[in-house]
Amino acid sequence: MPAEQQEQLPEENIFMYCDKVNEGAFTKLTNDYNFRYLYRTELEIWKSLPFDSDYTEANKLYMADYYNRAYKIRENEFYAKCVVVCNKDNEIIGSCFLWKLDEKINTLHWLKIKKEYEGKGIGRALISKVLENIEEIDLPVFLHTQPGSYRAIKLYCDFGFKIISNEKIGNRINNIDKCITKLEENMPKKYFKKIRYIKLSGEYLDIIEEKGLNDF
C-alpha cells in the first residue's frame, strides 16, 4: 500500500520489522501543530492524503476499496486509532496509526505528511506519538513500504525497524535485492550504513501466509 509519499522510483516491496522500539528517537511536535484523532466527517480527506494533489478517480476507487476491505468491518476501531496531525487552521497535514491484522500481527499503517510540510520533523513526531504507549504485548510491529520512501525508511530505522530479508512475506514477493540497490543509490551513505536486516522464521510468517494477511 502507498504508506508514505513516494519519490519517482520503482514500487517494489520492502517489509520491515521492529521488536524493540528505540525511544531515543522520539520527538515532540512544535506548537505550530497538534495531534488528534480522525473525525468521521473527514474520511474523504484522509483517503486523499497519500496522493497530495494527484487524487485521481482511479486513486479514489483504490482507497474506497482498500478502506472497505481493511477497515470497514472495524470502523469504530479505525476512528479510535487513526492519529492525524493538524496545523493551526485545523487542516489535516499528516496521518499514521497502528493496526492489528491478527492477535500477533501488529502493523504500522499509512504514514504520510503532506509534501509542503515535509522536512519539518513532523513525521518523526507523528511516529513518536503512535509508538509512545506501545507495550511489549504489542510487539513486534510490521510495515510495508517501497524504495521510493527512502526518507521514511531512514526514520523507521531510527525507531528500531529492520528490513526483513526473507524472499517472501505471505503471498507477496520481498524485492529485497532490487530495493537495497535503489536505497544505496538514493540514500546518503551515512544513513544507508545504519540499515539493519533480519531474517524471520516461525510463527509470524506462518500466520501471515496461512491467514492471507496482506493489508499492510
Give the role of each language-model region.
Residues 7, 131, 157-166:
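Conserved acetyl-CoA-binding loop of GNAT-fold acetyltransferases
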Residues 110-112, 130, 145-147, 165-168:
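Active-site proximal loops enriched in glycine and acidic residues that flank catalytic Cys/His/Asp
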Residues 113, 119-134, 154-158:
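Conserved acetyl-CoA-binding loop-helix of GNAT-fold acetyltransferases
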Residues 143-153, 169-181:
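Conserved beta-strand-loop-alpha-helix junction that forms the acyl-donor binding cleft
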Residues 134-145:
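Conserved GNAT acetyl-CoA-binding A-motif
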Residues 26-62, 86, 182, 186-189, ...:
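Short amphipathic alpha-helix that is part of the acyltransferase structural core
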Residues 51-114:
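A conserved beta-strand-loop-helix scaffold within acyl/acetyltransferase catalytic domains
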Residues 1-31:
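Acyl-donor-binding surface of acyltransferase catalytic domains
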